[in-house]
Amino acid sequence: MKLYFKQRFFSWFDSYDIYYEGGSVAYTVEGKLSWGHCLHILDPYGEHIATVKQQVLTFLPKFDLYVGERCIGTIRREFTFFHPSFTMDFCGWTVEGSFMEWDYTIQDGPRTVATISKELFNWTDTYPIDVA
C-alpha cells in the first residue's frame, strides 16, 4: 500500500492530510500547541484514532502513543553518533535513516515495514510512504 503527504509532514501546529495513492484522504493529522508537542490522528470521517504526545524534560526525545486514553507505548530516540535512530517499545520496531532528508525505513527486525522518502521533481515536496 502506498500513502502520500505533501510538504509539512511534521508541522506540530498545523493540520494536514495523508492520502491514498488514488487521492482520497486516509488520515488527517492535527497539531496542537501544548506543553511539549502533541499530534492527533483522525480517520477520514473526523473520528479520533490516536494521539502522539512528547514527554518533556527528557535528555533525548520521547513520544508516547495513546489510543483513546490508554498509552500503548513509547517512541524514543536512541543515542547514536552517525545517524538518528528511534525505537518503538510497544512493537519492537526501529526507525533509521536521514530524517533531515526525509529518507528512512521502519524495520521489524530484518523485515521492512515501511519506507519514507522525498519524491524529486514535483512542484511541492511530496513524500510517499510505502507500507509493506
Which stretches of residues belong to each language-model region?
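Intrinsically disordered, low-complexity proline/glycine-rich segments
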Residues: 1-132
